[in-house]
């Protein structure tokens, strides 16, 4: 019998006294959460943000984990000094790790452990603290905030302000729960609208004290406090665009030094609205279908499929990297599609009978019905298609992205969260139409759609990492910003020695969040009430 998820748990991470690996500055740490499923295999679940020049980081990113009472859930927290833009960790300095179980964290509520190196020796005086909270509340708070006349902390130019939100824990300490983006060179900043779960912000208690701090960002990590204020949700939710709630930003040190001190600026809350968000399971149980489409790279760089060196060569036991990636992801996602009929396309090959290069040809060669019956149907279409085509080029992604986007756009005509589209692209390398693909992704970010890219082989995947907006919002060549991060890129070879479920768990990890994010943004509800559906079964 499968384990039943008891609840969801939020994990907050902070570290102290990290090793300093940078010359002339401090380490730029990031924490990676790994999960152990069997034996010695660990797979990456999620990462925090990177904090520059800091040996005592408090990460604002929260890890959300399903808690299974009857399963020993082994976790590993790895801390790395990130000095480059690659997603690989092997080229970053390792600052230490901590292994524990989720049960240990939950039972102690806050667990502090020394960090150790791979050899088991102490990582200097470094330690890690993991705080756990059960998530019981799906209310979120939508904020719009700005400031005016902030103190200038920079000699050359103006302050680069950002906000931090802190809640008070039961032991009286402050825990950071949200950090806004930095607004560069501006004493009257307007921050982008943002949302924080009500539970994260104040444990759902409208009268619990919330502390907001305003800082001037500095590249060297020595961020200057501009000022702070304390409030409650009861006060904050009085805000409206026509009647903002305003707070003086007070710097205590300056107030004590100067009798004439008034404030260090004013923070204005223009919107503070509490709304209830549906969960991923609310949508799935409420009738939302995940529509799965596959795009396979048939460009010449894969090598002649008849040669054992080719990425398209099917080994005597019937597999290659393309098929393994397809099975891994497809087997998970097919359970969320009622008819299990999946369109499958190839790109970058010359196809019969004209032998023209095509970038969105159906692998079953039936343009009016490109659907394959289940994942097995896609595999069969792939196998029969391979000997009938000539691998060619270039590697263009935009046609197949735009193809799926047309269906996603049609689905937006419905007034409920009835359909969401997931495109899996399996490719061996360097993308040719990067500008067109950037534009296609930015356009698709406004649609009920996500894109998974699995890179097979050992090529340079830096362009793929660029499309995966983890380092910041992707922009089109015209400067338009993607309103959501909808691309997840994973190099297949990172999972060669991992359990067969690991690739799917990694690439699909962000899909629930992307589904919920889209439907909640557009205030779309599930087609059917989940409770009603459960009663009928």
Curated annotation (Swiss-Prot):
<dbReference type="GO" id="GO:0030335">
    <property type="term" value="P:positive regulation of cell migration"/>
</dbReference>
<comment type="function">
    <text>Calcium-dependent phospholipid-binding protein that plays a role in ERBB2-mediated tumor cell migration in response to growth factor heregulin stimulation.</text>
</comment>
<feature type="modified residue" description="Phosphoserine">
    <location>
        <position position="243"/>
    </location>
</feature>
<keyword id="KW-0479">Metal-binding</keyword>
<protein>
    <recommendedName>
        <fullName>Copine-3</fullName>
    </recommendedName>
</protein>
<feature type="binding site">
    <location>
        <position position="160"/>
    </location>
    <ligand>
        <name>Ca(2+) 3</name>
    </ligand>
</feature>
<feature type="binding site">
    <location>
        <position position="28"/>
    </location>
    <ligand>
        <name>Ca(2+) 1</name>
    </ligand>
</feature>
<dbReference type="Pfam" id="PF07002">
    <property type="entry name" value="Copine"/>
</dbReference>
<feature type="binding site">
    <location>
        <position position="154"/>
    </location>
    <ligand>
        <name>Ca(2+) 4</name>
    </ligand>
</feature>
<dbReference type="InterPro" id="IPR000008">
    <property type="entry name" value="C2_dom"/>
</dbReference>
<dbReference type="GO" id="GO:0030054">
    <property type="term" value="C:cell junction"/>
</dbReference>
<dbReference type="GO" id="GO:0005654">
    <property type="term" value="C:nucleoplasm"/>
</dbReference>
<dbReference type="InterPro" id="IPR037768">
    <property type="entry name" value="C2B_Copine"/>
</dbReference>
<feature type="binding site">
    <location>
        <position position="83"/>
    </location>
    <ligand>
        <name>Ca(2+) 2</name>
    </ligand>
</feature>
<dbReference type="GO" id="GO:0004674">
    <property type="term" value="F:protein serine/threonine kinase activity"/>
</dbReference>
<feature type="binding site">
    <location>
        <position position="93"/>
    </location>
    <ligand>
        <name>Ca(2+) 2</name>
    </ligand>
</feature>
<feature type="domain" description="C2 2">
    <location>
        <begin position="124"/>
        <end position="247"/>
    </location>
</feature>
<dbReference type="GO" id="GO:0071363">
    <property type="term" value="P:cellular response to growth factor stimulus"/>
</dbReference>
<keyword id="KW-0963">Cytoplasm</keyword>
<dbReference type="InterPro" id="IPR035892">
    <property type="entry name" value="C2_domain_sf"/>
</dbReference>
<dbReference type="InterPro" id="IPR010734">
    <property type="entry name" value="Copine_C"/>
</dbReference>
<comment type="similarity">
    <text>Belongs to the copine family.</text>
</comment>
<dbReference type="GO" id="GO:0005634">
    <property type="term" value="C:nucleus"/>
</dbReference>
<dbReference type="GO" id="GO:0005739">
    <property type="term" value="C:mitochondrion"/>
</dbReference>
<dbReference type="GO" id="GO:0005829">
    <property type="term" value="C:cytosol"/>
</dbReference>
<feature type="binding site">
    <location>
        <position position="154"/>
    </location>
    <ligand>
        <name>Ca(2+) 3</name>
    </ligand>
</feature>
<keyword id="KW-0965">Cell junction</keyword>
<dbReference type="GO" id="GO:0035577">
    <property type="term" value="C:azurophil granule membrane"/>
</dbReference>
<keyword id="KW-0677">Repeat</keyword>
<dbReference type="GO" id="GO:0005737">
    <property type="term" value="C:cytoplasm"/>
</dbReference>
<comment type="subunit">
    <text>Monomer. Interacts with ERBB2 (preferentially with the tyrosine phosphorylated form); this interaction occurs at the cell membrane and is increased in a growth factor heregulin-dependent manner. Interacts with SHC1; this interaction may mediate the binding of CPNE3 with ERBB2. Interacts with RACK1.</text>
</comment>
<feature type="binding site">
    <location>
        <position position="218"/>
    </location>
    <ligand>
        <name>Ca(2+) 3</name>
    </ligand>
</feature>
<dbReference type="Pfam" id="PF00168">
    <property type="entry name" value="C2"/>
</dbReference>
<feature type="binding site">
    <location>
        <position position="224"/>
    </location>
    <ligand>
        <name>Ca(2+) 4</name>
    </ligand>
</feature>
<keyword id="KW-1003">Cell membrane</keyword>
<feature type="binding site">
    <location>
        <position position="22"/>
    </location>
    <ligand>
        <name>Ca(2+) 1</name>
    </ligand>
</feature>
<dbReference type="InterPro" id="IPR045052">
    <property type="entry name" value="Copine"/>
</dbReference>
<feature type="binding site">
    <location>
        <position position="218"/>
    </location>
    <ligand>
        <name>Ca(2+) 4</name>
    </ligand>
</feature>
<dbReference type="InterPro" id="IPR036465">
    <property type="entry name" value="vWFA_dom_sf"/>
</dbReference>
<dbReference type="GO" id="GO:0070062">
    <property type="term" value="C:extracellular exosome"/>
</dbReference>
<dbReference type="GO" id="GO:0038128">
    <property type="term" value="P:ERBB2 signaling pathway"/>
</dbReference>
<feature type="binding site">
    <location>
        <position position="81"/>
    </location>
    <ligand>
        <name>Ca(2+) 2</name>
    </ligand>
</feature>
